[in-house]
Amino acid sequence: MSAFTRRTLLTASAGAAALALSSCGLAGGKDEGPTEKDGVTTIVVGASPKPHAEILQFVQDELAQEAGLSLKITQYTDYQIPNQALNDGDLDANFYQTPNFLEQQEKEKGYEFHGFEGIHVEPMGLYSDSLASLDEVPDGAKAAIANDPANTGRGLALFEAAGLITLKEGVDVISATPADIAENPKNIEFTTLEAAQIARSLGDVDLGAVNGNYALEAGKSPKDDSLFLEPGEDSPYGNMLVVREADKDNEALVKLNELLHSDEVKAFIEETYSDGSVIPAF
C-alpha cells in the first residue's frame, strides 16, 4: 500500500471551520487510502464535532490500537466540505451523514461513495427561544429549516409529524420543499438556512428544525429542550461511516466500521448520551 506524502486541510468557507483534533499533520496523499507503517494503519476521518468526533475519539482511545489502527480525526462544522474532502482524497472516510443526505449529494455532485450500516441516530427536533409549546405557535410564525435538500425534506416531514403542516400526497420527502406543502393552517413562513446556523438563529424565528448534533453543539438537550422530537426507533436517518466506492472493501476501513458497531461503542453512546439525544442504530 503506497504511503501518502501529504494531507491538506480544506479551508472552510462561509463561516465553516475545520479543526484538526490531532496536533500532528495529516498523513497521506490523494486518493490512495489509509497509510500503513510499522503494522499500524492510519485513517484520516472527517467528522462533525458532536457526537461523531467524540465517538471516533473513544474508538481511538479504547479500541484502535488493539485493532492495528490509528485515527486522525478532523472536525467540520459544515455539511458540504467533508464529502468534498473525501472525494478529493483529503480524507479516507467521513462520519457525519445520513443515507438520505448521501443519496442527495451523490445525485447533485456525482460522488461515488459507499455508506456502511447506520451507527447512531440523532433525532431532529423543533426548537424555539420564544415558545414553550407547539400550542403557542402563532399565525404567520416564522420557521427555519435546513437549506440542503435532504434536510429540507426531513425538516418539513418533522413539521408534518408535529401536526403543523401537511405535505402533498405522494411527495418524496427526500426532495420535498415548501412548495410541496398542501395544508398550512398556521400560515407558517419557512426560511432556509445552513443547517449549522439554525440553532444560533432561533432568536430571529419562532421555531426551527435543528439536527441533533447541532442542538448538542448549541448546548441544548433534544429530550428536554425540544418542542417536538423526531422518533428514534426504526429511523431511516442512521449516521454512518462513508468511504469512496473504490475503498469499500479496504481492510482497515472495514475494520473501523466494525469497531463503530462494537458493543463497546454501543455502551459508550448509551452512557454518554443518556438523555436520548444520540441513540445506537444497531
Question: What do the predicted segments below correspond to?
Answer:
Residues 73-84, 172-200:
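Short helix-initiation/N-cap motifs at beta->coil->alpha
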Residues 123-134, 237-250:
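A bilobed periplasmic-binding-protein/Venus flytrap-type ligand-binding module shared by bacterial periplasmic
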